[in-house]
A protein has these predicted regions:
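A short, Lys/Arg-rich alpha-helix, primarily the initiator
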Residues: 1-21
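Short, charged recognition helix plus adjacent turn
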Residues: 1-5, 60, 70-83
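Residues within the helices of the helix-turn-helix
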Residues: 16, 27, 56
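Alpha-helical residues within the helix-turn-helix
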Residues: 20, 31, 60
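Residue-level detection of the helix-turn-helix DNA-binding "recognition helix"
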Residues: 20, 34, 45, 74
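Short alpha-helical DNA-recognition segment
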Residues: 23-42
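The DNA-contacting recognition helix of HTH DNA-binding domains
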Residues: 26, 37, 47-48, 66
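DNA major-groove recognition helix of helix-turn-helix/homeodomain DNA-binding modules
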Residues: 53-68
Length: 83
C-alpha cells in the first residue's frame, strides 16, 4: 500500500466536537448530509477535505457559518474561546 498523500494546505474542522455536543452518531450525521459514515470519519480525522457543497451541508446541519466549522488554521479549544 502506498503512503497516504496529505493535502498541502489541510482544512481543519470541528465536525467531531460539534457532532459529540449534539449526541449525534456518525451514522446520523452521514444520513443528514447524504454521505457514508466512513466519509464522516475521514473528515473528522482530517483524511478527507470536503467539497464546498458538502461543507455547506454540514454547516446547515449544525446551524453554523462555514468559518465556525472549517478553517485553514488549527482551531483553539472551544473552552478557550468561550471563557
Amino acid at each position: 500500500m502506498s503512503p497516504k498523500k496529505l493535502p498541502k494546505d489541510p482544512i481543519y474542522n470541528r465536525v467531531r466536537v460539534l457532532r459529540a455536543e449534539r449526541d449525534m452518531t456518525r451514522i446520523q450525521l452521514a444520513e443528514l448530509i447524504n454521505v457514508n459514515p466512513q466519509t464522516v470519519g475521514a473528515l473528522e480525522r482530517g483524511d478527507h477535505s470536503p467539497s464546498l457543497d458538502l461543507a455547506f451541508r454540514i454547516c446547515e446541519v449544525f446551524g453554523l457559518p462555514v468559518e465556525a466549522v472549517f478553517s485553514r488554521t488549527e482551531f483553539a479549544p472551544m473552552s478557550k474561546e468561550l471563557y
